[in-house]
Amino acid sequence: MIDLTAAPFSLDDDGIAWVRTTLAEMGEDEKLGQLFCLITYTSDPEYLGYLTRGLHVGGVMLRTMTAADAAATVTTLQSTATVPLLISANLEGGASQTVQEATHVGSNMALAATGSTDHVRRAATVIGREARALGINWAFTPVVDIDLNFRNPITNTRTFGADAATVAAMGAEYVEAIQAQGLAASAKHFPGDGVDERDQHLLASVNTMSVEEWDDSFGVVYRAAIAAGVKTVMVGHIMLPAYSRALRPGVADRDILPGVVAEELLNDLLRDRLGFNGLVVSDSTTMAGLASVLPRSQAVPRVIAAGCDMFLFTKNLDEDFGYMRAGIRDGVITPERLDEAVTRILALKASLGLHRGTNLPAQGAAGVLADPDHSATAREVAASSITLVKEEPGVLPITRERYPRVLVYDLQNGGSPIGQGARAGAVEQFVDALVEAGHDVTRFEPGGGWEGMAAPTTDVTERHDLVLYLANLSTRSNQTVVRIEWAEPMGANVPAYVHSVPTVFVSFENPYHLFDVPRVRTLINTYGSSPVVLETLLAALQGKAPFAGSSPVDAFCGQWDTHL
């Protein structure tokens, strides 16, 4: 029996009565629909009405759109739903991932680089305030993974770094601050990403920690989030073999499954050992991390049967609903388990006050998004986070008088259709700022010529006063590495002039580029590329502001030569 009076629901008598009455009035189809949190890219009323009246979905996740479209979408959904919806969004770095006009406050790693939980609290408050004004009530944040493996292609700047105590403290601060704004937070990605160098989007990855190691790291992190009152936990397609073996003695290797379908991790570890009473949601079920371990027909109902309360996204809407219905019919999901999951979904809604009608966008949402205090917070985070990792004496500052002629090497990857990846145009924006500051900027273009036919080195050493690398390479789904791919021929754009021309390397995203450019003597990490970050970076390079951040990870990647 779920204790609805206990944290994180903490319901009063009216809330409990609403949960019990609503559950009792539901038929099987309504209960089935509540299990699903679907994605919406559109504000089309007909489609949205189908989600609420036809499928009875429990929630949706908004993808990138304008503030007006987001408000219209939420209004349509909530006004047509019999049971109010959970409106979720990926709020990593800010509501700007979902709403174009919102403030990008800064990545988790930028917040960690400030060394201040006060910055975390203020950032989460801004994010929550903007999201709630738009009718968003469920934040798919914070990421509380620990970035222990610099080769991991998906955690990176999304995390609070590599120190478990820091991640625990900042994750808990984030949870308290954003939930104080009326949203449910979601600590992710249980049982913990950042250990494997592979991406759970593309396979079932492995957290290789022993039971003791996990307890002393991720265990500390999740206990802190739970103590802070986190309402939901998102479970990834990540295996934790040591704990699966400890909790299921004799389990065969082939039967060790990722967290999202591992009953021993969801119930024995998360519920019983860690004491989590809130809602458990799967990570996206469209990921190969789930598809690679079970056929879809089995995987869909197993997610709920194993202990997740909500099923995130579908591969094929009709097919997945059919698989879930079959799982209920065939007893894979028992009536008791179905009611337990739906009860937690309804309890989460009641804990947010949705049963009282506090679920529509605010009339003054545009004013909230334009609040100058929010942009001021973003500036303070940027000013406190940009990190001078490595410095060659005498190279900085960069001024027009010292370096009139600058050769820029830009290293970039693109964004994805769903808004992930590096911010397009960041390098161009920074180059424009250099030109405006009076520098004569040349952007490197690879030329022809193999051995014996390349341009003379004096073309660089005598024509340029500074070499500046601008790397805008970020983590994104479906990418197995976040490394530099050099140009032909023969690495035409590698740092070949570090002994001849002052060279500065700036990474807008990935903090681990020293692994590929160990001989670069001056390197700066910014952990983001928003206009505010670029403006702050330029001021620091010019000597007008300090480099105030401290690296939350080993930017030297454990290598001796990166210190040269």
Curated annotation (Swiss-Prot):
Keywords: Carbohydrate metabolism, Glycosidase, Hydrolase, Polysaccharide degradation
Documented EC number(s): 3.2.1.21, 3.2.1.52
Enzyme class per UniProt: hydrolase
Key word Zinc-finger present: no
Record flagged with keyword Signal: no
GO biological process: peptidoglycan turnover; polysaccharide catabolic process
Family annotation (InterPro entries): Glyco_hydro_3_AS, Glyco_hydro_3_C_sf, Glyco_hydro_3_N, Glyco_hydro_3_N_sf, Glycoside_hydrolase_SF, NagZ_Beta-hexosaminidase
pH dependence (UniProt free text): Optimum pH is 7.3 with 4'-nitrophenyl beta-D-glucopyranoside as substrate. Precipitates below pH 6 and stable from pH 6.8 to 8.4.
Catalytic residues as annotated in Swiss-Prot or TrEMBL: D283 (nucleophile)
Disulfide topology: none
GO molecular function ontology, one term from the record: beta-glucosidase activity
Catalytic reactions of this protein: Hydrolysis of terminal non-reducing N-acetyl-D-hexosamine residues in N-acetyl-beta-D-hexosaminides; Hydrolysis of terminal, non-reducing beta-D-glucosyl residues with release of beta-D-glucose
Function of the molecule: Catalyzes the cleavage of beta-N-acetyl-D-glucosaminides and beta-D-glucosides. Might be involved in the degradation of glucuronic acid-containing glycosaminoglycans such as hyaluronic acid.
Other facts noted in the record for this chain: Catalyzes hydrolysis by a double-displacement mechanism via a covalent glycosyl-enzyme intermediate, involving the participation of a catalytic nucleophilic group in the enzyme active site.
Similarity remark: Belongs to the glycosyl hydrolase 3 family.
PANTHER family for the chain: BETA-HEXOSAMINIDASE, BETA-HEXOSAMINIDASE-RELATED
Protein's name in the database: Beta-N-acetylglucosaminidase/beta-glucosidase
